[in-house]
Structure formats: structure tokens, C-alpha cells
């Protein structure tokens, strides 16, 4: 359960970083 949550958090983090890089 904790690992699945961690995967979702990491996935969301990558998505945010991707959007930031896209804006730059």
C-alpha cells in the first residue's frame, strides 16, 4: 500500500517537472 502511494507521488512529481520544463 505504501509503495503504491509512493509510486503515485513520484509519478505526480515527474508530471509537474515535465510541465515546468515545458514552460521553460
Swiss-Prot record:
Q: Which InterPro entries match?
A: Antimicrobial_9
Q: In which tissues is it expressed?
A: Expressed by the venom gland.
Q: Where in the cell is it found?
A: Secreted
> Its GO biological process terms?
defense response to bacterium; innate immune response
Cellular component GO terms, alphabetical = extracellular region
The keyword Secreted is assigned to this record = yes
Respond yes or no to whether keyword Secreted is given for this record.
yes
Q: Which UniProt keywords apply?
A: Antibiotic, Antimicrobial, Secreted
**Which family, according to UniProt?**
Belongs to the ponericin-L family.
Protein's job: Has a broad spectrum of activity against both Gram-positive and Gram-negative bacteria. Is inactive against yeast, erythrocytes, and insects.
The protein in question is named U1-poneritoxin-Ni2a
Q: Which organism is it from?
A: Neoponera inversa (Ant)
